[in-house]
Design a protein with these regions (language model features):
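N-terminal low-structure segments adjacent to metalloprotease catalytic domains
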Residues: 1-75, 94, 318-343
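Generic preference for hydrophobic/aromatic residues in regular secondary structure cores
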Residues: 24, 49, 56-62, 82, ...
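Charged, low-complexity, helix/coiled-coil-prone segments
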Residues: 30-53, 123-125, 146-154, 170, ...
Length: 343
């Protein structure tokens, strides 16, 4: 089995692969939580609601700046710096950089008061592209993965095959039939760096949520998002993008076990990633008035330094987990997914 086949087969197992390294252990998270947002930005975030746009678009022709030095090629888009150990054509860089810029654009619309956007971090976000897969593993990549975000030193590592790059003669071409959800997933982790990278269900639910938004020609098709999520969970996903194929009747562990476990515990949950995605979407679009207010308030509590237990009270809103399970079940049942919780 060659490298391309290895990666393709691993896509369906992406939920079982720890895509965030031990740098998300409690100590580094506590350190990043010490950076407190300014009162003005907190107030502004509290007023923001969930994005209502049906579509979000980038310019059709993204400007790319290129710099070269011996053995290294650097390409810069508006917010990202891509450093490659092999040369790439400009149109190829424009194609994959749009995935990162679309992720940045959407995450910037979320009402989560992202530390990334207001702590004076004006430098480009770092993405390192690695031609050889074994080199990717030596640099810290997870075996079988198509990319990984390292909280320290705050960069994304991606092997060429994770981008869908294939050698053609003396250069690389991009396989446009491939889903690149992994890239948006890791870019979402990068955007949410700080106090929000704490609870596994929220960390991975948010990343899966953003990564499942369909894309066409530099445009996020938000209007088709729920259908994309359904396909990703019950079948093989948009453009066969590594979906979980769980079927329309899904048995899950208790909601309490998902929401109260730490990040390492989350990694051990069966089907934790699609489970977290369904829960995240529910809180964003169906709970309460359907405006994501409780999810926003939960994130705001984390940003203010609250522990997970205290922040979760914003989501529970006086309800117990059994009540939330019924609400979650009823909500997804209306959209063709039958959930059954094990208690």
């Amino acid at each position: 089995m060659d490298a391309g086949e290895r990666f393709q087969s691993s896509l369906t197992q992406v939920a079982e692969t720890p895509l965030i390294p031990p740098s998300l252990s409690p100590a580094p998270r506590a350190t990043s939580a010490s950076h407190q947002p300014t009162p003005l930005l907190v107030e502004r975030s509290m007023r923001r609601s969930w994005p209502q746009q049906k579509r979000l678009s980038l310019p059709q022709e993204l400007p790319i700046r290129k710099f070269t030095q011996t053995g290294s090629w650097t390409y810069r888009s508006k917010h990202f710096r891509f450093t490659s150990n092999a040369p790439l054509r400009d149109h190829v860089v424009r194609e994959f950089s749009s995935l990162f810029e679309l992720t940045h654009l959407y995450c910037s619309q979320l009402p989560f008061d992202l530390e990334r956007l207001h702590t004076g971090r004006k430098s480009d976000l770092e993405v390192r592209l690695i031609e050889d897969y074994s080199h990717y593993l030596r640099e810290g990549g997870a075996s079988g993965s198509g990319g990984i975000y390292l909280t320290e030193p705050d960069l994304i590592l991606i092997p060429f095959e994770g981008l869908g790059l294939k050698k053609k003669y003396d250069s690389y071409a991009l396989d446009l039939t491939r889903s690149n959800q992994t890239l948006m997933h890791e870019a979402t982790h990068m955007m949410m760096r700080g106090p929000l990278l704490k609870d596994g269900w929220f960390v991975e639910g948010a990343a899966e949520y953003v990564a499942t938004i369909p894309i066409r020609k530099n445009t996020l098709l938000i209007e088709n998002h729920r259908e994309s999520i359904k396909s990703y969970v019950v079948s093989y996903g948009y453009r066969d993008g590594g979906g979980h194929n769980l079927g329309r009747e899904i048995e899950l562990s208790s909601l309490q076990s998902l929401m109260e476990c730490d990040y390492r515990g989350f990694q051990e949950l069966e089907n934790g990633y699609p489970y977290a995605l369904l829960v995240f979407h529910y809180f964003a679009h169906s709970d309460g008035d359907g405006d994501g207010a409780r999810l926003r308030d939960y994130a705001q509590a984390l940003n203010k330094g609250a522990d997970s237990s205290t922040a979760r009270k914003k989501l529970l809103a006086g309800r117990d987990y059994r009540t939330l399970e019924k609400l979650l079940t009823n909500s997804w049942n209306q959209h063709g997914i039958a959930l059954k919780f094990r208690n």
